[in-house]
UniProtKB/Swiss-Prot annotation:
Topology term for the membrane: Peripheral membrane protein
GO terms (BP aspect): proton motive force-driven plasma membrane ATP synthesis
Name this protein carries in UniProt: A-type ATP synthase subunit D
Record text on subunit structure and interactions: Has multiple subunits with at least A(3), B(3), C, D, E, F, H, I and proteolipid K(x).
Gene Ontology molecular function terms on file: ATP binding; proton-transporting ATP synthase activity, rotational mechanism; proton-transporting ATPase activity, rotational mechanism
NCBIfam families per UniProt: PRK00373.1-1 (NF001542), V_ATPase_subD (TIGR00309)
Gene symbol of the encoding locus: atpD
Task of the protein: Component of the A-type ATP synthase that produces ATP from ADP in the presence of a proton gradient across the membrane.
Organism encoding this protein: Archaeoglobus fulgidus (strain ATCC 49558 / DSM 4304 / JCM 9628 / NBRC 100126 / VC-16)
Family under the similarity heading: Belongs to the V-ATPase D subunit family.
Keywords for this protein: ATP synthesis, Cell membrane, Hydrogen ion transport, Ion transport, Membrane, Transport
Amino acid sequence: MAEVQPTRMELIKLRRRIKMATRGHALLKMKRDGLIMEFRQLLEEAKEVIGGMVQKYEKAQSKLALAIAVDGIVAVRSIALSCCQIPPEFSMKRKNIMGVVVPVIKREPIRKKPTERGYGILSTSTRVDEAVEAYEELVDAVLEVAEIETTLRKLIEEIERTKRRVNALEYRVIPTMEELAKFISFKLEEMDRENIIRLKKLKMKKAKS
């Protein structure tokens, strides 16, 4: 504080900075609260989506077990390799949530017609078709979960960053500037008192002379 020039101009500048910091603090708190609300809403959605994915996984496993029992493990493995030759098609886009850029997976329909799956439908049972269909649904659910989990992670990172900025302004930056403003005000008042005393002494000297 000793290095600060206790001038009225410095005090005016400092008060402007305090005003700006206070406004910034309020805006950041609004952003933090908005992000937390978005996070909570998405978290509820994520619970449902993950629950659905788990159900689809269990269904796919059950259908796979039936397909193996009917067609045999060798045939099912061969069909699985054929299906893997045609990977799912999707593209990545982005959207903005309160300043946070998050991914959006634009998915093409995962479920294909039996003739588009890369294996001979005449040489397999309907159990295989049901298993393949169940896994197609599972892949779609996995992509949806991946999108939501990535968005949640990015939101929580931004919430933590915003919290740190809010706390820095609230507990360090603004209090420090306010203390500095008090110090300058005190010094200016002290200088004013000294000037008044000096003027009184000068008047007294002139009156005596």
